[in-house]
Amino acid sequence: MLQKTVLLLALVAQVLMLENGLLRTPPMGWLAWERFRCNIDCVEDPKNCISERLFMEMADRLAQDGWRDLGYVYLNIDDCWIGGRDASGRLIPDPKRFPHGIAFLADYAHSLGLKLGIYEDMGKMTCMGYPGTTLDKVELDAETFAEWKVDMLKLDGCFSSSRERAEGYPKMAAALNATGRPIAFSCSWPAYEGGLPPKVNYTEVSRVCNLWRNYKDIQDSWKSVLSILDWFVRHQDVLQPVAGPGHWNDPDMLLIGNFGLSFDESRAQMALWTVLAAPLLMSTDLRTISPQNMDILQNPLMIKINQDPLGIQGRRILKSKSHIEVFKRYLSNQASALVFFSRRTDMPFRFHCSLLELNYPKGRVYEGQNVFTGDIFSGLQTEVNFTVIINPSGVVMWYLYPIKDLGISTMMSHW
């Protein structure tokens, strides 16, 4: 009964959220920060500095290399773009690095079928020391972003108090809506309040934000990925019910294509973020990404699972003594996704299990597909044991759907 209640509450919570009609599925795109940080040296490093050129080149790659057509449509500027404020108090971009302005970049992105995201901070300064959005500047900055035809705002939380954030984030949401332009709102609010109740009221956050950072910034290492995953798992009973169409928990960017993850770890992050219904925001150099990493990020079935219209966040349902964990996500049309994740550090492990042990209903027969290999299997009965072989720090991921009911039970499966 408790397990059924958890699923019911997740569905009810989605209904109670206030909507601006945006991000009915998790956003997909590219974000500058993890890979390019605050590199503003356009003399020594003109190809990689935070500049108009960088974003135009990434826009070209999104449009020409298949990313846009798979759903990766957001081109998101992060910190270090601001040049200051003009005499009327309006934000202006750095004139040397963004000589044509942000509206020019927005028009360029839109001409390629993309959307432009921008960054500010709910505080006196951004995290890297550029002019922030103080409470008296909220409406002005929202109007400026709308005039520039921006499509998403990421609002950070450095250099502000809890009181200022509690007032400022709802105020910005209202100001964005008042512009009449559809601007998705990415909040860092929960992360600056510890990510958990009672300091974080996720009902309120969900009414204000389309997505929100809950925890620490990701760094280019497997240790960082695991720390974020561990936090999400520890608190999944709080986090899972508040996610849904238009409102997403954000465990931060995808590292795939950078320097810190192995091949298996890259596949693991992609699979785990997908089953968590996380935003798929890449932060890598799309000009030099390897075909192997492109294959991970452009996996059509993976993207289909991430973008499932039900929008139910998955959760860990099994932690075995053999250091194998199983994550499950409910999908539309009675389908589901399973991720078998190995915490082992020795060798590939043969994991034996049955769907019955993973809370699938008795008496059903399933067909499925291995998300990474594409192999299709059929005739898997709930009660029959199967074996998956999982590499250390790797995953096996299945997409499953019932093809037959043997008449024993037709009840909906539960967590």
From Swiss-Prot:
InterPro entries given in the database record: Aldolase_TIM, Glyco_hydro_27, Glyco_hydro_27/36_CS, Glyco_hydro_b, Glycoside_hydrolase_SF, Melibiase/NAGA_C
Which sites carry carbohydrate?
A: 177, 201, 385
Give disulfide pairs as residue numbers.
38-80, 42-49, 127-158, 187-209
Protein EC:
3.2.1.49
- Gene3D superfamilies in alphabetical order: Aldolase class I, Golgi alpha-mannosidase II
Q: What is its main location?
A: other
Mention one GO biological process in which this protein takes part, according to its record. glycolipid catabolic process
Signal peptide region: 1-17
- Please give the residue positions where the record annotates the modification Phosphoserine: 322, 332
Q: What cellular component terms from Gene Ontology apply here?
A: lysosome; membrane
The UniProt subunit note reads as follows: Homodimer.
The similarity annotation says:
Belongs to the glycosyl hydrolase 27 family.
**Entry-linked PANTHER family:** ALPHA-GALACTOSIDASE/ALPHA-N-ACETYLGALACTOSAMINIDASE (PTHR11452), ALPHA-N-ACETYLGALACTOSAMINIDASE (PTHR11452:SF25)
Q: What is the designated name of this protein?
A: Alpha-N-acetylgalactosaminidase
What is the originating organism of this protein? Answer: Mus musculus (Mouse)
Supply the source organism's classification.
Answer: Eukaryota, Metazoa, Chordata, Craniata, Vertebrata
